[in-house]
């Protein structure tokens, strides 16, 4: 649920959110998917820079890092641990399981309980954790009964290996069904200023006090173009289109927790600066009209 507390650092200006009444984070987090090679596969082009990015994120006040075993695979989790372990107090690390990676840009759902339990064990080992703060089902595998997949996470939670459970790329019905099996604290769906297909999911998260984590929050490249509404707003605010897009997300709902990712310290610093960018009602209205027209 959103709170009125104050996190430290520039990222703290984004406001706060609490998962499950006990995990307090700054709303602007960091997504670690880009700390890998092309196709979200293998090592990053510059591992030293990737390590610098993660460390700089924490210096800027970010205390919520989202990763997954599928990123690399395994590479992203390993870089997070190498950069930050032993972890600073208050850092919340979220990861995900439920995919297999046969190659670059290839993703295959695997929700078999034995796979999910093995995936969680691997993440614990790579991240050097005794317990994962937020473990998310990366996708609901249509080949496996959802209750079996969620039951595996419930078992892991009962064993003390994960603290809280989240979902990814789900609709409202799937969230409700999951909540009948195990407590859910977050949903991670694709969402941005230019992609709002999951408005109903966002509204449900607001009603339930669930964190809504938009992946692809900058809609990679869709914000470009000097004639676009976002670029026009950015020029008025003396900001970048990406900063406007992130500031819009933060203003859109107190349960939205953006996790922009990058492998560049420069881009990271630009993204975090969005926490201090004020979006007025006129700009919110203009961006809303842009969405309705698209």
Residue ranges and their predicted role:
Residues 20, 81-92, 125-128, 179-181, ...:
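Acidic (Asp/Glu)-rich catalytic clusters
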Residues 43-57, 111-127, 171-176:
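Short, acidic/polar
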Residues 1-91:
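N-terminal binding-site loop/beta-alpha segment at the start of enzyme catalytic domains
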Residues 124-143:
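Active-site groove signature of glycoside hydrolases
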Residues 42-49, 75, 79, 107-115, ...:
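Alpha-helix N-cap and loop-to-helix initiation/capping positions
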Residues 3-11, 16, 140-294:
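Beta/alpha (TIM)-barrel catalytic core signal, keyed to glycine-rich beta->alpha loops juxtaposed to Asp/Glu
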Residues 21-41, 94-107, 131, 136, ...:
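N-terminal small/glycine-rich loop or linker at the start of catalytic domains
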Residues 30, 67, 95, 134-137, ...:
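Conserved beta-strand positions
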């Amino acid at each position: 649920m959103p709170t009125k507390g104050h996190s430290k650092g520039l990222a703290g200006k984004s406001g706060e959110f609490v998962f499950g009444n006990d995990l307090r984070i700054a709303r602007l987090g960091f997504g670690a998917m880009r700390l890998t090679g092309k196709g979200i596969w293998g090592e990053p082009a510059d591992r030293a820079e990737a390590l610098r990015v993660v460390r700089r994120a924490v210096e800027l006040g970010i205390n919520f890092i989202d990763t997954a075993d599928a990123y690399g695979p395994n590479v992203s989790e390993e870089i997070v641990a190498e950069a930050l372990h032993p972890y600073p107090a208050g850092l919340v690390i979220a990861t995900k399981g439920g995919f297999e990676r046969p190659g670059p840009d290839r993703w295959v759902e695997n929700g078999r309980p034995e796979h999910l339990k093995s995936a969680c064990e691997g993440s614990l080992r790579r991240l050097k954790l005794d317990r994962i703060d937020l473990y998310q089902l990366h996708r609901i595998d249509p080949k496996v009964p959802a209750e079996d997949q969620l039951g595996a996470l419930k078992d892991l939670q009962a064993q003390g290996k994960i603290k809280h459970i989240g979902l990814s790329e789900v609709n409202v019905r799937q969230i409700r069904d999951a909540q009948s099996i195990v407590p859910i604290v977050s949903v991670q769906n694709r969402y941005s200023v230019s992609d709002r297909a999951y408005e109903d999911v966002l509204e449900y998260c607001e009603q339930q006090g669930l964190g809504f984590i938009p992946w692809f929050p900058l809609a990679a490249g869709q914000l470009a173009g000097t004639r676009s509404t976002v670029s026009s707003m950015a020029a008025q605010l003396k900001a970048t289109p990406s900063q406007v897009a992130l500031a819009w997300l933060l203003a859109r709902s107190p349960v939205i927790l953006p996790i922009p990712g990058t492998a560049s310290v420069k881009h990271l610093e630009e993204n975090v600066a969005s926490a201090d960018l004020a979006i007025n009602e006129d700009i919110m209205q203009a961006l809303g009209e842009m969405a309705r027209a698209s």
